[in-house]
């Protein structure tokens, strides 16, 4: 997770996974919005296990993507998780899906299948969602229309 909305939406999922002894849940933060993220993780009692620290001043989207790829891939190589879970439409979602695909690690996507019908709007979020979808293993679509969008794209 990297943003405040991601943390808010994943907080109950993290809490449920950590309550269940069958799961060893590790929370990784990209450091996109450190202070806002920390407010949410503190409020929900979420311990962040790893910070990737990818943000730089005046960083371009391409620069962020490159830093995310290196940081996420390095972390996946060290941690070797059984599965990864991402949420939303950020560049982190796209890059994590690609890094997991390269390492043959299954990945789940919370809020999968949401579509605006215009790949350029919102930018880059709509493209992130569409590009990640074919690489994702488990799609957690929040609505029937999101599910239908995935099925319409040949993603199942």
Label every PLM stretch briefly.
Residues 21-67, 71:
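Conserved nucleotide-sugar phosphate-binding/catalytic loop shared by glycosyltransferases and other
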Residues 69-80:
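Short, well-structured alpha-helical segments in soluble
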Residues 21, 79, 103-105:
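Helix C-cap/helix->beta junction micro-motif
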Residues 1-31:
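N-terminal subdomain of nucleotide-sugar transferases
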Residues 3, 89, 143-145:
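Helix N-cap/beta->alpha junction signal
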Residues 105-156:
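Active-site-proximal region of nucleotide-activated glycan assembly enzymes
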Residues 85-103:
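An aromatic- and histidine-rich active-site surface loop
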């Amino acid at each position: 997770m990297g943003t405040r909305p991601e943390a808010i939406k994943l907080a109950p999922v993290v809490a449920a996974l950590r309550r269940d002894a069958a799961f060893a849940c590790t929370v990784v933060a990209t450091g996109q919005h450190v202070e806002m993220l920390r407010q949410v993780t503190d409020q929900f009692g979420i311990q962040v296990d790893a910070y990737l620290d990818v943000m730089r001043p005046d960083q371009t989207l391409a620069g962020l993507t490159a830093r995310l790829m290196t940081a996420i891939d390095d972390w996946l190589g060290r941690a070797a998780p059984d599965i990864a879970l991402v949420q939303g439409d950020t560049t982190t979602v796209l890059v994590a899906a690609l890094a997991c695909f390269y390492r043959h690690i299954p990945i789940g996507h919370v809020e999968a299948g949401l579509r605006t019908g215009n790949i350029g709007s919102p930018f880059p979020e709509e493209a992130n969602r569409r590009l990640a979808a074919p690489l994702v293993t488990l799609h957690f679509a929040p609505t029937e229309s999101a599910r239908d969008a995935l099925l319409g794209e040949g993603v199942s």
